[in-house]
Amino acid sequence: MKEILEKIKKNAIEELNNVVDKETIESIRVKYLGKKGELTKILRGMGGLSAEERPIVGKLANEIRKNIEEIIETTLKEIKEKEKNIKLSEETIDITLPGKRQYLGKRHPLEQTLDKMKEIFINMGFTVEEGPEIELDYYNFEALNIPKNHPARGEQDTFYINDNVVLRTQTSPIQIRTMESQKLPIKMIAPGKVYRSDSVDATHSPIFYQMEGLVVDKGVTFADLKGTLDMFAKKMFGEDLKTKFRPHHFPFTEPSAEMDATCFVCHGEGCKVCKGEGWIEILGGGMVHPQVLKNCGIDPEVYSGFAFGFGVDRMVMQKYGIDDIRLLYESDMRFLNQF
């Protein structure tokens, strides 16, 4: 019996020394140590041995079993290590190869311009206020001194959700809400999207960006408005920029004016951007109408204020010489990558 056990050990070790994969190891384990394996059969047949042989054969069989298990474990580790090394060698990165440049996105020119505008006004002491884009008719029109039969209320200019609710046509409602809810003095800007019932063409869009501003305090004058807007224009387009004001009419300001600036492309010489005039209209404003102050519970005999507003899209188009507003909304990377 001892010779049979030694032969089993020898054969198992020889087979394990020639193993090249995990599947073969498993088949050898089953062959010798499985339920029907050669060594298992001997252990199960020990009942037929004499009392003197049984402990000797049992001890030797268990030693051989342990020895085969250790060799199987060691061989299995070696094969796994070889497989890992082969896989790593096949996946080796050649560090001498040129890298692949990842595409870096750019911020939209509208966003860049809005952020610059906000930064300028914040540095001048303004706060940034926000409001709903779906607005009550009262805040969008009536509180701003735009009566029921005013042309601006026509369906050709406004998206009506129902008789009392509209998509805001301007960010002016934020001024009303701010005057109603905050303590005086007020110094704020209101940037955001607005909506008009316009057909899409090179200069019109049903959605665009607007920024409005409001200052209310005791002793505010038109000179304060001029100084604020002149400083903004110079910070936005260059210190050598010149501005001028022309009388105009807005229902919510009195007196009202539009501000022109020397063309920031030709610097007043005349070009296609300014249509040869050397000046570009960039915004409108004026002193807050006394009725608007009254609508917000502010005494116009004690307080005064100025308000202004401008289209951000239009200013972007003027600054960069863009002749079609649709380019700002079509997400064409060939266009946007220029900024």
UniProtKB/Swiss-Prot annotation:
Q: Which GO terms describe its biological process?
A: phenylalanyl-tRNA aminoacylation
- Determine if Ligase is one of this entry's keywords: yes
Named cofactor requirement(s)? Mg(2+)
Q: What is the lineage of its organism?
A: Bacteria, Bacillati, Bacillota, Clostridia, Eubacteriales
**E.C. designation(s):** 6.1.1.20
> Where in the cell?
Cytoplasm
How and how many cofactors are bound, per the record note? Binds 2 magnesium ions per tetramer.
Keyword Transmembrane helix assigned to the entry: answer is no
Regarding protein family, the annotation reads: Belongs to the class-II aminoacyl-tRNA synthetase family. Phe-tRNA synthetase alpha subunit type 1 subfamily.
The record's listing under HAMAP family reads: Phe_tRNA_synth_alpha1
GO cellular component assignments: cytoplasm
Q: Which reaction does it catalyse?
A: tRNA(Phe) + L-phenylalanine + ATP = L-phenylalanyl-tRNA(Phe) + AMP + diphosphate + H(+)
Give the InterPro entries listed for this entry. aa-tRNA-synth_II, aa-tRNA-synth_II/BPL/LPL, Phe-tRNA-synth_IIc_asu, Phe-tRNA_ligase_II_N, Phe_tRNA_ligase_alpha1_bac, Phenylalanyl-tRNA_Synthase, tRNA-bd_arm
Alphabetically list the UniProt keywords: Aminoacyl-tRNA synthetase, ATP-binding, Cytoplasm, Ligase, Magnesium, Metal-binding, Nucleotide-binding, Protein biosynthesis
This entry's Gene Ontology molecular function terms read:
ATP binding; catalytic activity, acting on a protein; magnesium ion binding; phenylalanine-tRNA ligase activity; transferase activity; tRNA binding
Q: Under which name does UniProt file this protein?
A: Phenylalanine--tRNA ligase alpha subunit
Cite the binding residues for Mg(2+).
254
Q: What is its main location?
A: cytoplasm
Q: Which PROSITE patterns match?
A: AA_TRNA_LIGASE_II
Q: Which residues form a coiled coil?
A: none
Subunit arrangement?
Answer: Tetramer of two alpha and two beta subunits.
